[in-house]
Amino acid sequence: GINYEDRSEPFLGASGVTHPLLSEAVTQFQAQSYKEMLPSGGPVKTQVLGAPTQETEAQAQRVEDFMNYQITEIMEEYDPDTDQMLFYLPLTGSTFKKIYFDETKQRAVSKFVPAEDMVVPYSASDLRTAERVTHVVRMSYNDIRKLQIAGVYRDVELSETNDGEDEGAIKERSDELLGLRPNYSDDSYTLLECHIDLDLEGFEDKDMEGNSSGIMLPYIVTLDQSSGKVLSISRNFREQDPL
């Protein structure tokens, strides 16, 4: 129903009427989307392109069965992360999925990335053609240390944790709508994972004569936001990929 409360902000006598319409709409959207995107048999459906044969149909079925097994049984975070993403989507308008190979788990993982944690240039129209894509990653010291021991990140000393920094108006508003309120410090670090094109000395693109072409190549550069220290630079392309 409609609730009413006396308010003095932003001015005396301001309307204090509230109604859970947005919460109801979000819940309905989440429930309907979850049913469509995560059916009981698994989210993957395969289709044979071209004239189907018994062999290609059997191959497609094997791919479908394996992918659904991978997502529903092995990737334990896929279901709850997707469920959470579908709750955020109607509130923020955009959400992202990040699927990558996790060195500590030694398997593919699927992570929900809120819109406020994905930073692109203002002129970008999509992620594929954006000159730079930065994922704001919040990670505990223990998880960072695991990656340092595994050789993924440089073994360098990090600055003090920066979990108390402002996370932005979008995050604050979405937490307010969800009824969330942080009541403790999780001592997390903020890392910036930048997907960017670089022309690194000693790793230049070569032309047919073996000379540097001057073409920048895609890399992933991860750094600690607080100290500015680079933790890793990794190649984001295969040798056979087109320029």
Model regions: which residues?
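Extended, helix-rich architectural segments
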Residues: G1-P242
